[in-house]
A protein has these predicted regions:
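Short amphipathic alpha-helical segment with a characteristic S/N-K-E followed by hydrophobic residues
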Residues: 17, 55-60, 70, 120, ...
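Hydrophobic/aromatic residues within well-ordered alpha-helical segments
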Residues: 13, 56, 63, 67, ...
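Amphipathic alpha-helical linker/stalk segments
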Residues: 27, 61-91, 96-98, 102, ...
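Key DNA-contact positions within bacterial/archaeal DNA-binding proteins
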Residues: 47
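Hydrophobic/aromatic-rich alpha-helical bundle segments in the mid-to-C-terminal region
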Residues: 122, 144-194, 204-205
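Basic, helix-initiating cap at the start of DNA-binding domains
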Residues: 1-44, 52, 57-58
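Helical hydrophobic small-molecule/effector-binding pocket
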Residues: 88-121, 162-169, 198, 202-204
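Amphipathic alpha-helical packing segments from all-alpha helical-bundle domains
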Residues: 85, 104-105, 109, 119-145, ...
C-alpha cells in the first residue's frame, strides 16, 4: 500500500473510532465508558486504538473538540456592507448548530463529567464560547472597515450578540426535552438581531 493510501486508511479508521466512541459516550457518559466498550462496538485491537488516541481521556477530548468546533464555526457570510443580513446569516448558522442534537448532548455530557474531568469543560469553553466570540468579533471588525453602520466595541458586541441569541432557548433545550422548530429558531435570530442593532450599532452616515 502506498504512503498516501495508508494515510487515507488511517484517517478513515480514526473517524470510525470517533463516530463509534461518540455514540458510546453519549449513551453511557464518560465515567461509565471504557475503551473495551468502544472496541466491542467497532472491533479491532487496543493497540490500533491507542495509536490514534493514547487513552480514554484523549478520545473524549477529541469528541468534545469536534462538536465544540461545529458550534463555534460561522458560515462564510456575504460581505455586502449591509449589517442586518450579516447578523441574520451568522446568527442562524450559530443557533442551528448550537441547538443541534449532538452539540446539546456534548454540552450535557461535558457538564455532567466536569467534577471528575475538568479538562473537558476547558476544551468546551476554549473551542466553543470563547472561539465563537473571537471569530464573531473579527467579522464585526471587518464589517466596520467596509459597512455603513458601525458596531461599537466589536469584542464586547460579539459577546452580547451571542448571549442574546442563546437567551432562554438554549437553556430550555439543554435542560429539558424541548425541541424548537425552524420557525422558532428563525424568530429568535430575528429578535436578537433587532435588539443588537438598537443597542450596539451606530450609523456612520
Amino acid at each position: 500500500m502506498s504512503e498516501n493510501g495508508h494515510d487515507r486508511r488511517s484517517a478513515q479508521r480514526r473517524e470510525e473510532i470517533l463516530a463509534t466512541a461518540t455514540e458510546v459516550f453519549f449513551a453511557k457518559g464518560f465515567s461509565r465508558t471504557s475503551i473495551d466498550d468502544v472496541l466491542e462496538r467497532i472491533g479491532g485491537s487496543k493497540r490500533t486504538l491507542y495509536r490514534h488516541f493514547p487513552g480514554k481521556e484523549a478520545l473524549f477530548t477529541a469528541i468534545v473538540t469536534t462538536f465544540s468546533d461545529r458550534a463555534s464555526n460561522f458560515a462564510p457570510a456575504t460581505q455586502s456592507g449591509e449589517l442586518r443580513p450579516l447578523l441574520l446569516e451568522l446568527g442562524q448558522h450559530y443557533l442551528e448548530n448550537l441547538l443541534s442534537r449532538d452539540v446539546v448532548a456534548m454540552f450535557r455530557m461535558a457538564v455532567a463529567e466536569a467534577p471528575h474531568f475538568p479538562e473537558v469543560t476547558k476544551v468546551v469553553y476554549e473551542n466553543g464560547p470563547k472561539r465563537a466570540c473571537e471569530l464573531l468579533a473579527k467579522k464585526f471588525t471587518e464589517h466596520n472597515r467596509n459597512g455603513r453602520e458601525k458596531i461599537d466595541n466589536p469584542a464586547e458586541a460579539a459577546q452580547a450578540f451571542l448571549a442574546t441569541l442563546r437567551g432562554d432557548l438554549f437553556f430550555r433545550v439543554l435542560l429539558t426535552a424541548y425541541q424548537p422548530t425552524a420557525t422558532q429558531i428563525k424568530k429568535s435570530v430575528s429578535v436578537a438581531t433587532e435588539q443588537f442593532v438598537k443597542s450596539h450599532v451606530t450609523s456612520s452616515g
